[in-house]
UniProtKB/Swiss-Prot annotation:
The keyword Mitochondrion applies. It comes from Ascaris suum. The pyruvate dehydrogenase complex catalyzes the overall conversion of pyruvate to acetyl-CoA and CO(2), and thereby links the glycolytic pathway to the tricarboxylic cycle. K(+) binds at residues 143, 191-192, 194, 196. This is Pyruvate dehydrogenase E1 component subunit beta, mitochondrial. GO terms for biological process: glucose metabolic process; pyruvate decarboxylation to acetyl-CoA; tricarboxylic acid cycle.
Amino acid sequence: MAVNGCMRLLRNGLTSACALEQSVRRLASGTLNVTVRDALNAALDEEIKRDDRVFLIGEEVAQYDGAYKISKGLWKKYGDGRIWDTPITEMAIAGLSVGAAMNGLRPICEFMSMNFSMQGIDHIINSAAKAHYMSAGRFHVPIVFRGANGAAVGVAQQHSQDFTAWFMHCPGVKVVVPYDCEDARGLLKAAVRDDNPVICLENEILYGMKFPVSPEAQSPDFVLPFGQAKIQRPGKDITIVSLSIGVDVSLHAADELAKSGIDCEVINLRCVRPLDFQTVKDSVIKTKHLVTVESGWPNCGVGAEISARVTESDAFGYLDGPILRVTGVDVPMPYAQPLETAALPQPADVVKMVKKCLNVQ
């Protein structure tokens, strides 16, 4: 009865941090299906409870429960001392957070959209990312910058940009790009516990998607190591490397390609800085073909970096076809729905590129 009650809460989308914690406790012997939103909420709850130095700061994160309800129930549970609402001023949010981190606290700085992290980029890169190096290792800046990254639905140019490649470019930060619930939970908890800056690039569409959470991942001490990709779908004919919501696009494409007898290996990067190139390289050596999939623009993108590394490595000699990329179109994001769809990678785009790489019709 208790199990059924918990599952009803999950199905109805009424799970608060407290309810999810109770569900995990009661169903510890089995796998849970929860949304990415709830996985992040539970991870925040557990880390704030675990360490008195951890606090959440951002716009509408407290009394409103967060713009995407990631912080639902946390202000009521922990109060103003741990959950800080701020004015709409990303520069001040980032600067205050970096100062707090330099003075012994462990802030989780939420940007309602990573598009507006650019308002605080000086603090993120010049202060947080460089302090450890500039101090010859004497200073640590234990801070998490997190928020919705990339396109959602109908939010146009100024809320749709994918900043993965921007932050991947910068030394001094770790950059994680979760896909499913275990990614979101394990990487966020690892980020909070890290002694230097971590940028968590989440996806708004994924927030509402449900994924299984294994008994192991339900543990309050579950963390995922940085720089460890996951083979989301094993295969032998071609390697598809992707991240965040691009993994979902790639998996749908792989299902379609399987109908034609093409067996795709789909790699979920999970983290782009550090990048698990070894997993990519081993897969390319096995399949002898590579396609990358990302939502960001093509110039200087994640796929371009992976392509360069494969070309510069001994995996290049194993390739039986060109390295091809599926990316967002090189334009500011349109608002009109048909144009927005056309500007983003779709499963059909991946199918087409895989067949081109394999030289099949």
